[in-house]
Amino acid sequence: MSKVLVLKSSILAGYSQSNQLSDYFVEQWREKHSADEITVRDLAANPIPVLDGELVGALRPSDAPLTTRQQEALALSDELIAELKAHDVIVIAAPMYNFNISTQLKNYFDLVARAGVTFRYTENGPEGLVTGKKAIVITSRGGIHKDGPTDLVTPYLSTFLGFIGITDVKFVFAEGIAYGPEMAAKAQSDAKAAIDSIVAA
């Protein structure tokens, strides 16, 4: 039995293309892998606090007493990291906003990236500590950016996930959604076909 963690990060709730596709992924996965456990965390519905000058102090080793906000941030960071490490497959619904990921997803990454916990520095360079995972990124875009200089989502997510130890990453693209109903429908159809292929593998 595998454990699947689905991270939603769109601010558009049910209207969101990436949310719809991640819901489709869950439906297909449950159909093919009925014994698996699926956890869904909506980072827009339940937002992660923004990392600021106060909160960053909670995530670094120190003997200084923590404020209430810092204690809450550290507890949430511990919870998010434990959840991430406890799952085998990580599904990230990542819409493109202004060429990059949403603030909601970035805030999550800022609490998950902790030296000595999810990565460490060695004589040979940084080493990721979140290993043995597979990641599937479902990314929706209004325009067409794949393989172009305006796609900052793909290299950023590949780099971040690899940095914490997740190197088996597959991307599902839904592009051109803002080009009209016909293009949006094709983007959804193509993305669902890619999801079907991943689920069946």
From Swiss-Prot:
InterPro entries: Flavodoxin_fold, Flavoprotein-like_sf, FMN-dep_NADH:Q_OxRdtase_AzoR1, NADH:quinone_OxRdtase_FMN_depd. One of its GO terms (molecular function) is oxidoreductase activity, acting on NAD(P)H as acceptor. Keywords: Flavoprotein, FMN, NAD, Oxidoreductase. FMN binds at residues 10, 16-18, 96-99, 140-143. It catalyses: 2 a quinone + NADH + H(+) = 2 a 1,4-benzosemiquinone + NAD(+); N,N-dimethyl-1,4-phenylenediamine + anthranilate + 2 NAD(+) = 2-(4-dimethylaminophenyl)diazenylbenzoate + 2 NADH + 2 H(+). Its cofactor is FMN. Its EC number is 1.6.5.-, 1.7.1.17. Binds 1 FMN per subunit. It holds the Pfam family Flavodoxin_2. It comes from the Bacteria. Belongs to the azoreductase type 1 family. HAMAP family: Azoreductase_type1 (MF_01216). Quinone reductase that provides resistance to thiol-specific stress caused by electrophilic quinones. Also exhibits azoreductase activity. Catalyzes the reductive cleavage of the azo bond in aromatic azo compounds to the corresponding amines. Homodimer. This is FMN-dependent NADH:quinone oxidoreductase. It comes from Escherichia coli O157:H7.
